[in-house]
């Protein structure tokens, strides 16, 4: 247990940006959920068992008459399909984590993935425990935010118009932090270019999957040039 205690202690400073972001977007989710007339306990339960970030924001609009089960499955897949690519890059690392790998797979979000790929393991801490601590703390921030937002939304009337932009804002902040922290920004430039091109070609509703495929293909082709230049541990 002392190993886990040290891992959580060392991991916490790295999760502070996620803490500030997840608390606010978790609160926003809770408020939106409560505005639909649902109990804040259900919002907390969803954050514990589903933990899908943008998928949960989308799910708020699914709990209405006329939305079919197939529509829910399709839209959720489209929103979260990028996680397939995240998982592929972390397969080797997760396979070394024993039973903890099942939670690591479940707890993989955009922000957690970013930390797992860019954070260097501090000395004196086991890698699997350190990465596990990051994932656990990130989800706890989301759950706490959902509880606060759900409770506040139940007790205080809110106008939630535009509140779902909080998730987009968090993505932008994390990207900017990554950009400023790196010397080699080729992968980021490729990501921006691929997204813009696919947005123009496929439209706003269908560009995510083609963008991810294009990014993976281009990075794979130029990987020999990037090796030794990039800091990411997910390469």
Stretches found by the model and what they are:
Residues 1-11, 124-126, 223-235:
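Intrinsically disordered, low-complexity non-transmembrane regions of multi-pass membrane transporters
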Residues 10-105, 119, 141, 207:
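Pore-lining transmembrane helices
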Residues 3, 74-164:
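Helix-loop-helix junctions within the multi-pass membrane cores of secondary transporters/permeases
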Residues 128-211:
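Membrane-embedded alpha-helical modules
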